[in-house]
Amino acid sequence: MASARNGVSKDELLPVYERRSQRDGDISGSVKSFASTIGNSASAAVLAYCLSSISMTLVNKYVVSGASWNLSFLYLAMQSFIGTVAILACKKTGLIQNLALFDLKKAQTWLPISLLLVGMIYTGNKALQFLSVPVYTIFKNLTIIVIAYGEVLMVGGGVKPLALLSFGLMVLSSVVAAWADIQNATTATVGASSDSTAAALSALNAGYAWMGTNVIFSASYALGMRRVIKKTNFDNWDVMFYNNLLSIPILLLASVLAEDWSSENLQRNFPAELRQSLFIGILYSGVAAVFISYCTAWCVRATSSTTYAMVGALNKLPLAVAGIVFFAAPVTFGSVSAIVLGFISGLVYARAKSTGA
């Protein structure tokens, strides 16, 4: 009472360390409250998913777009190694709490899926090397069609009318994109030698061939993973960990056998003036692959699978626009029409998934 009469508060009578502990507890509580708010925010989840997936595609395009680039297996091995280290670091710090210990038997069961993943990411990077980001994005929609009919063959059932309409729009957008690409290639080489035109068309044909192969690998990976994941009882982080870990020796072996590791070739692939930015891109892509996996689960948890499907459809447009902005992809009536058709097809497909029509 005397202290109160003398104008000294109760808090001032507490020992310094107790007041500091109380203050730190208040700050910690505020941080946890803010983190909880963000974690349950649908807007934050959608934004994080969109930014991570767009940036990942753009960084991959940047790394593999060098005129002399021919070390895709090595690049992907580095990416997988960085992803594995990032996952283990997250587990060590407590950010990931449900990652099980490595199981050799489960690894053997999962190995065929990792082989399909290697095929998927390698062919995807090769397609990006020859095709523009908008065209790559549009053709990627074809994977949805192959998966849908693969599921029909595996589990029966059929494809509903609205889904069929979306598939038709996807095919049409791909045809328009290819037509616009070929028109641009021939127009850009007008006045040049016939060899230049032939080289441009040859590069496009290589890109389409890699894209077609990527669609097959992507669909096979998705369909195979759904079957094997039931046997292993993996969650999202287990899938990410085993995919990255098992891919490393496969990719390294493929790189040693198929790629040139001479100092001259390494110099051509990583020129001194671009070396730092390329390595930053490789580091980012490895970490971003883990972040995309987290954001996918976050988006589904904070919203719904229907909203996630819709976001995936809407994400095609900013990704295509980003490709035009950052890599100067040609803007023509054909290319814009293909992007719009691809965007609409994604919306129709998301609607078909949500209504079952």
From Swiss-Prot:
Protein's cellular compartments: Golgi apparatus membrane; Cytoplasmic vesicle membrane; Endoplasmic reticulum membrane
Cytoplasmic side: 1-33, 90-107, 151-161, 218-236, 299-306, 353-357
Organism listed in the record: Neosartorya fischeri (strain ATCC 1020 / DSM 3700 / CBS 544.65 / FGSC A1164 / JCM 1740 / NRRL 181 / WB 181)
Keywords carried by this UniProt record: Cytoplasmic vesicle, Endoplasmic reticulum, Glycoprotein, Golgi apparatus, Membrane, Sugar transport, Transmembrane, Transmembrane helix, Transport
Lumenal compartment segments: 55-68, 129, 182-196, 258-277, 328-332
Gene behind the chain: gmt2
Glycan attachment points: 184
Name this protein carries in UniProt: GDP-mannose transporter 2
NCBIfam families: nst
Subunit (UniProt): Homooligomer.
Pfam families from the UniProt entry: UAA
InterPro entries reported in the protein's UniProt record: SCL35B1-4/HUT1, TPT_transporter
